[in-house]
């Protein structure tokens, strides 16, 4: 499995965890200790805040990732950039450009930074 496939598999695992209500556990294990998420509303969460917010977060029904591309950011890091679309009940779909930056450390890929930019 190449790097793009490995990172995309992690992205899908993360989205599935958000659909299943286990995002707090998944991202608690995936994120680096100093990791952060920058959300569509402008909030910036450190790892502990991500875990706490996902503990009670409503689940998504479905999701899709399109336009995925990998950007190498260093010898032990890479980012995936894509468009994500998620659906929940009768709400309008959430759609944003997303970037996940990973660092290879301790023998595995860890999420260092995740960022969302909502689409109009």
Regions found by a protein language model. Name each.
Residues 1-29, 34-120:
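A beta-strand edge to alpha-helix "cap/lid" segment located at domain peripheries
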